[in-house]
Amino acid sequence: GTITSGLDRFMEWKSKDGQSVDEAFAQFDTFYEGMFQKERLLDILKNFILFSGTGAGRFKVLAGYHQYFAVRKAIEKAKIATRTDGKGGVFWHTQGSGKSLSMVFYAHLLQEALESPTVVVMTDRIDLDDQLYAQFSQCADFLRQTPIQAESKEHLKSLLDGRTANGIIFTTMFKFERGEKPLSERRNIVV
């Protein structure tokens, strides 16, 4: 939680390193060593605090420990993937754990880590596409760009062809068929 959050938005920092988690309850040293290492604290302040919402409904968000460590690990996997087979892996969180915001933090960090790639967020449901697009749109200042929703396969292709870097584009998998040619040959697209 942040200073403007209700008590229900506060959570414990339960890991020092992202590997082991004290599930019973958080210890002070776990919180202190997990969050207040100099480099990590500066990273959290720079990359893991954002504002979401609009107008009077705007609020500050601070990543939880599980989001911080998962996003940092995903960024490292993405860097490796660009030098190897191109496969970054799967990002998994339980329901209600802040997956959408983890994705926002990830997209934000990718811009620096991979030299301004285009991020394509592909979902299997229209309602999920709309939900994620709305969440990312509310965080456009943090992302330093305005997300776009592709309305068709042709629109997606033109969005990819019309840029050499940057962009966060939302689409559904229903716009594709098996055996199709790639929509782009660019190497700096993260799906």
Write out the residue ranges for each language-model feature.
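Conserved helicase motor
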Residues: I126, P147-K157, T172-R178
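Conserved motor-coupling elements within RecA-like helicase/translocase cores
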Residues: E151-I169, P182-R186
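Short, hydrophobic beta-strand segments that form beta-sheet elements in well-ordered domains
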Residues: G1, I148-Q149, V191
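Short, intrinsically disordered, charge-balanced linker/junction segments flanking boundaries
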Residues: R178, N188-V191
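ATP-dependent helicase/translocase motor core
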Residues: G1-T118, D127, Q131-L143, T164-I168, ...
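Phosphate- and divalent-cation-binding pockets in alpha/beta enzyme and binding domains
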Residues: Q131, R178-G179
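Hydrophobic positions in the central parallel beta-sheet of the AAA+
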Residues: V121, I169-T171, V191
